[in-house]
């Protein structure tokens, strides 16, 4: 019995170390290397680089691990994460998650179509609304690892949706939910929904 208890405690302890919580204060210094593309506070000034500010820790951590492990290809980040430990990545994720994402503006001509897709999906084609995973306000569900979209650059969102549709981005889990959704979006759909997301808050 005692051996079982000790074994259990050791296992729990090791698990806790393997999934150590991120330290936002420590992450600020470690995130300096990210600033050139993503902005010092995670609000990227360049529309092709995603805003990381206010993004859920779980999502950020998964993306960094996927990029580091080669499960998601981002040419601009090649080699940048190689020498960072799991704790470094957790700290960086915690720092960016603690920041506030800035909000952009949607193209007025695309708002109606974008909102209809985001809130209603394309039911006839079996595409669910984005709100189910990303919430009506676009903040996502951090605990489930569903990303915060509201305020994200339209250029970046459009690129990701296109990559999911074309199969060049595949790190959306075993269910391939984003690939199946993006497959039902036309170029015009992607432009409208991406613009709507940029202005969503």
UniProtKB/Swiss-Prot annotation:
Q: Which SUPFAM superfamilies match?
A: Cytochrome c
- Give the signal peptide, or none: 1-20
The job of this chain, per UniProt, is described as:
Diheme, high potential cytochrome c believed to be an intermediate electron donor to terminal oxidation systems.
Protein source organism: Pseudomonas aeruginosa (strain ATCC 15692 / DSM 22644 / CIP 104116 / JCM 14847 / LMG 12228 / 1C / PRS 101 / PAO1)
**Cystine pairings recorded for this chain:** none
Which InterPro entries does the record match to this protein? Cyt_c-like_dom, Cyt_c-like_dom_sf, Cytochrome_c4-like, Cytochrome_c_Oxidase_Subunit
Offer one Pfam family short name for this entry: Cytochrom_C
Kindly state which keywords UniProt assigns to this record, in alphabetical order: Electron transport, Heme, Iron, Metal-binding, Periplasm, Signal, Transport
Highest taxon of source: Bacteria
Q: Where does heme c 2 bind?
A: 130, 133-134, 178
| One GO term describing the cellular component | periplasmic space
Q: What is this protein called?
A: Cytochrome c4
Posttranslational modification: Binds 2 heme c groups covalently per subunit.
Cell compartment(s), UniProt:
Periplasm
| Positions annotated to bind heme c 1 | 34, 37-38, 77
GO MF annotations for this entry?
cytochrome-c oxidase activity; heme binding; iron ion binding
* PANTHER family given in the database record: CBB3-TYPE CYTOCHROME C OXIDASE SUBUNIT FIXP (PTHR33751), CYTOCHROME C4 (PTHR33751:SF9)
């Amino acid at each position: 019995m005692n051996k079982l208890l000790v074994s259990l405690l050791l296992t729990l302890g090791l698990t806790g170390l393997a999934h150590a919580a991120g330290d936002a204060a420590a992450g600020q210094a470690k995130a300096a290397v990210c600033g050139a593309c993503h902005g010092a506070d995670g609000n990227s000034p360049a529309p092709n680089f995603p805003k990381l500010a206010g993004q859920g820790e779980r999502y950020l951590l998964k993306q960094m691990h996927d990029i580091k492990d080669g499960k998601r290809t981002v040419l601009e980040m090649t080699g940048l994460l190689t020498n960072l430990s799991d704790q470094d990545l957790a700290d960086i994720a915690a720092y960016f998650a603690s920041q506030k994402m800035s909000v952009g503006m949607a193209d007025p001509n695309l708002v109606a179509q974008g909102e209809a897709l985001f809130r209603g999906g394309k039911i006839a084609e079996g595409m669910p609304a984005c709100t189910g995973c990303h919430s009506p306000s676009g903040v996502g569900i951090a605990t489930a690892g569903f990303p915060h979209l509201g305020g994200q650059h339209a250029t970046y969102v459009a690129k990701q949706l296109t990559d999911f549709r074309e199969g060049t981005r595949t790190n959306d889990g075993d269910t391939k939910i984003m690939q199946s959704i993006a497959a039902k979006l036309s170029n015009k759909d992607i432009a409208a929904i991406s613009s709507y997301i940029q202005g969503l808050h």
